[in-house]
Amino acid sequence: MTYPEEIDEYSLIQNGLKSLNEAAQRCQQTKHSSQDSSIEGCSARQSARDELVLEALKFLQIAQGPIDAAATCYERTAHLASVRALLEMGVFEALPTGRVSRRTEELARELNVDESLLARLLRNSSLYGPFEETGPGQYRHTPFSEAYLRPEIRGMFRFAMDDHMPAHLKLHEFLQRNGWQEPSSTTDNPYTYAHKTNGKSMFDNLSEKPERMKAFNNGMTVQAMTPLWMIDLFPWRSLAQLKPTAGQVLAVDIGGGKGKAISRIRSFCNGLPGRYILQDQEHVVKSVEGSLDPSIERMAYNFFTEQPIRGAVTYLIRRCLHNWPQDSVVCILQNIAAAMEPGKSRLLIEEIVVPAEKAGVEEGWMDMIMMSLGAKQRTLKEWEMVLGLAGLEVKKVYQIPGNCHGLIEAWLK
């Protein structure tokens, strides 16, 4: 462990274990006391689990001690490399589900790979998962390895390893080369530096690599699986006070993807007259043809251009702005602001709002990913700043205590 002599390492371990047990008890209590499917109930359960995970990570570090904790960089990277190799090798599919074991010699013959290589990779991928060693040279699936059989989880992992990991490993080189300045370009950032994209953004680079783009798209569907929709916090039924007409646009979902958010909004406004519009790039809009309620209009739109829908009651942009540097964000917001009607239109932004202090694990790693792309997750102060540059001001922030995601309501100044 190698703690300084004046520190009682076992007292630290006992205190850490106490904190971990208390977090586990809170997690269990929250699970039993908050069974409802509301956003508040889901958020309470997620926050309790996040706290438990953070306390577990802290306890692991205490148990390891300063030197061993630093040395786990070898362990973590080796474990990730082993799992990535086994994924490409086809081992995840070759092992049967249902907790049935197979021997390495059988797998090696079936996959036409070197048995010694396979055994070494499986050995390192079974110490604490995702696989389980059940006997000499015998391995089987666990729920943690079976998760990788899902296309969205597989895509997320592949994209993290093949695209983001190289950017993280080259982060220090890029920052040093650029005088330790915050990355703020979509075409000159740690990602483009690591992948040598020759002036192309990540998205332009991926468009030339179909398999990588497929992994990215599959991985992004994980985000859509969240039960935490911050738009649920907005009082949609209060729009009835405006006495909307059938021809009035109640909501425009900008960059709305498959239309899940605008469909959700329409259900909240059920019975209110008005139009609902989904906007996204042309190929995205075409992909949802036939899958949306006919009452929801579809419109091809690039949010870096003039907003064609003017005077809508509500404009929504959800989980898009964190992908862009400040200048781009201000441009997007200015296009929306120019279409808004004073005293009538509001803009809703669903994004992470990074706490001013003691940020959590999610907002931490998410911001590092955004940094590699020249973008960022923002604090409320930073959101107020970019909105101000676009002629907007924050009226209200809808947020659940302990949750980093929020819904920012902004109006014209």
Swiss-Prot record:
InterPro entries: COMT-like, O_MeTrfase_dom, Plant_O-MeTrfase_dimerisation, SAM-dependent_MTases_sf, WH-like_DNA-bd_sf, WH_DNA-bd_sf. Keywords: Methyltransferase, S-adenosyl-L-methionine, Transferase. Pfam families: Dimerisation, Methyltransf_2. One of its GO terms (molecular function) is protein dimerization activity. Its cofactor is S-adenosyl-L-methionine. Pathway: Secondary metabolite biosynthesis. S-adenosyl-L-methionine binds at G255, G256, D280, N302, F303, R319. It is an enzyme of class 2 (transferase). Its EC number is 2.1.1.-. The active site is at H322. The keyword Metal-binding does not apply. One of its GO terms (biological process) is methylation. Disruption phenotype: Leads to complete loss in coumarin biosynthesis. Belongs to the class I-like SAM-binding methyltransferase superfamily. Cation-independent O-methyltransferase family. Non-reducing polyketide synthase; part of the gene cluster that mediates the biosynthesis of the bicoumarin kotanin. The non-reducing polyketide synthase ktnS first catalyzes the formation of the pentaketidic 4,7-dihydroxy-5-methylcoumarin from acetyl coenzyme A and 4 malonyl coenzyme A molecules. Further O-methylation by ktnB leads to the formation of 7-demethylsiderin. Then, an oxidative phenol coupling catalyzed by the cytochrome P450 monooxygenase ktnC forms the 8,8'-dimer P-orlandin via dimerization the monomeric precursor, 7-demethylsiderin. This is O-methyltransferase kntB. The gene is ktnB.
